[in-house]
C-alpha cells in the first residue's frame, strides 16, 4: 500500500538560513536556543532540566541541526542510534510565512513578492478600511496596527465588546487579521466579515496571502482567550501542488488535519479534520492514519509550536510542547508499515528567544522514516520543494517543476 504521512511542526527551525541577513534573522536558531535555555535551567516553568527529545533524536533531528549550524543541540543524545533518513532544507520562497513554507513543501515555491502592510501604526490604507466598514455595516474599527494577537486583546478587547467595533491588525507576514468576541460579536458574523475582507483585498489587488479570523472569549482584559474556531481564507497556490496532483492524477485521497486545508485554500483536499491543541491534533492524526487506504496522504500541521509558543516567545512552553510531541511520536512511528513513509518537517522558524514576535528565516529539518527507508544523512536540501518532489515520485505523479527527490 502507498501511503505518506507528513507532519509539519509549525515554526520548528534548526538554524539561520543562508539568506537570514535579508530578514534580520542572522543567528536565529529555534531548536538550538531552546536547547541552550533548557540546559542552563532557564526553561523550568512547567517542565525541568535539559531538553528531552529521544525519539526525534533517533530520527536524526539533532544530527540535522548539527549539519545546519555546526553545533550539536545542547542536552540531546550524541550516541543515539539513527533509525531514519535526515536532512536540513533551505527555503527559496520570497517570504518566511506559513503559505510560502507549506506551498514550497508541496512543490510550489512562492517566487513572487506578497503584498504587505509595513507601517506599524495606521497599517491599512484608508480606502481598504472605508470599503470594509461600508460593505459590512460596521460602526467602525479598532487596532489598524502591527500587534501580537494576545496583547491586542488585552488592550482593545473590552472596547470591542462595548462598541461592536472589530479589531483589525497585521504583522510582518502577508496577513489581514480580524479579532472579534464569539459571543458579543458572533462567530458567524465574524466569518462573514472575513469573507468580505478577502473579497475586497483580492479585488483591490493588495496581494495579501491570508485573511485570518481570530475569535476569542472572556469577560475582561487578562481573561481573554483565543478559541479553536480560527478560520483562514488564503489565496490558492499559483500551480498544482503535489496534493492536487495526487487527487487528480491518481484518484488519491488527501486528508487535512488542522489548518492544512485553509493553507492550500481547500485545493487538493479530500477530507478536512479540525482539531485544536497538540494532543487533539495527535489524536486526530492517529485516527486518520489508522483509516488511511491506498494512495492516501495524511497531512497535519501542529500549529501550537508557532502560535502558542514561538510568537509569544515562550521558551519553556515551546520546550514542553516539543517533549509532548516526542513522547507521542512512537504512536505515529508504530503505524508506519510496508511501503509507508512518515515525513517530519517545518515551514519556517519562530525562535522564542529572538527579538520581536515574528517568524525567523531558518533551515528546517527533513526527517523521513519507514520500513523501506535507508537511515543516514541526505544532505543539505536547497529547497523545501525536495519534499514535494519526493512525494510525487513515491506516488508516481508527474514531476513537480521544482525540487529534487530525496530518495
Swiss-Prot record:
Record bears the keyword Ribosomal protein: no
Enzyme class: isomerase
GO molecular function terms noted in the UniProt entry: magnesium ion binding; manganese ion binding; phosphopentomutase activity
Major localization listed first in the record, in broad terms: cytoplasm
Residues where Mn(2+) 1 binds: 10, 347-348
Enzyme Commission number(s) of this protein: 5.4.2.7
Entry similarity comment: Belongs to the phosphopentomutase family.
Protein name in the entry: Phosphopentomutase
Organism: Sodalis glossinidius (strain morsitans)
Gene: deoB
Amino acid at each position: 500500500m502507498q501511503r505518506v504521512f507528513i507532519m509539519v511542526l509549525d515554526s520548528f527551525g534548526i538554524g539561520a538560513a543562508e539568506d537570514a541577513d535579508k530578514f534580520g534573522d542572522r543567528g536565529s536558531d529555534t531548536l538550538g536556543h531552546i536547547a541552550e535555555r533548557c540546559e542552563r535551567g532557564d526553561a523550568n516553568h512547567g517542565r525541568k532540566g535539559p531538553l528531552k527529545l529521544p525519539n526525534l533524536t533517533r530520527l536524526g533531528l539533532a544530527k540535522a541541526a548539527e549539519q545546519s549550524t555546526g553545533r550539536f543541540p545542547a542536552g540531546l543524545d550524541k550516541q543515539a542510534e539513527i533509525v531514519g533518513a535526515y536532512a536540513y532544507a533551505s527555503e527559496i520562497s520570497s517570504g518566511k510565512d506559513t503559505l510560502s513554507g507549506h506551498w514550497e513543501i508541496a512543490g510550489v515555491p512562492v517566487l513572487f513578492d506578497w503584498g504587505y502592510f509595513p507601517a506599524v501604526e495606521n497599517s491599512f490604507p484608508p480606502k481598504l478600511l472605508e470599503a470594509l466598514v461600508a460593505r459590512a455595516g460596521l460602526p467602525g474599527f479598532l487596532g489598524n496596527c502591527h500587534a501580537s494577537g494576545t496583547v491586542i486583546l488585552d488592550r482593545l478587547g473590552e472596547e470591542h465588546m462595548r462598541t461592536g467595533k472589530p479589531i483589525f491588525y497585521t504583522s510582518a507576514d502577508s496577513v489581514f487579521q480580524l479579532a472579534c468576541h464569539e459571543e458579543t460579536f458572533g462567530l458567524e458574523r465574524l466569518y462573514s466579515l472575513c469573507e468580505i475582507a478577502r473579497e475586497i483585498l483580492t479585488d483591490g489587488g493588495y496581494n495579501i496571502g491570508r485573511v485570518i479570523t481570530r475569535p476569542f472569549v472572556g469577560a475582561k482584559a487578562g481573561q481573554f482567550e483565543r478559541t479553536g474556531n480560527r478560520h483562514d481564507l488564503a489565496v490558492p497556490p499559483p500551480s498544482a501542488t503535489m496534493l492536487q496532483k495526487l487527487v487528480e492524477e491518481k484518484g488519491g485521497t488527501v486528508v487535512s488535519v488542522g489548518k492544512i486545508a485553509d493553507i492550500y485554500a481547500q485545493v487538493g483536499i479530500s477530507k478536512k479534520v479540525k482539531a485544536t491543541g497538540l494532543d487533539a491534533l495527535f489524536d486526530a492524526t492517529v485516527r486518520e492514519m489508522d483509516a488511511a487506504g491506498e494512495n492516501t496522504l495524511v497531512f497535519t500541521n501542529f500549529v501550537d509550536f508557532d502560535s502558542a509558543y514561538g510568537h509569544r516567545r515562550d521558551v519553556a512552553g515551546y520546550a514542553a510542547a516539543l517533549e509532548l510531541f516526542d513522547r507521542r511520536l512512537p504512536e505515529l512511528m508504530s503505524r508506519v508499515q510496508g511501503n509507508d513513509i512518515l515525513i517530519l518537517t517545518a515551514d519556517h522558524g519562530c525562535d522564542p528567544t529572538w527579538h520581536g514576535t515574528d517568524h525567523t528565516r531558518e533551515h528546517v529539518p527533513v526527517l523521513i522514516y519507514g520500513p523501506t527507508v535507508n537511515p543516514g544523512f541526505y544532505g543539505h536540501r536547497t529547497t523545501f520543494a525536495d519534499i514535494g518532489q519526493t512525494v510525487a515520485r513515491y506516488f508516481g505523479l508527474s514531476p513537480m517543476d521544482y525540487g529534487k527527490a530525496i530518495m
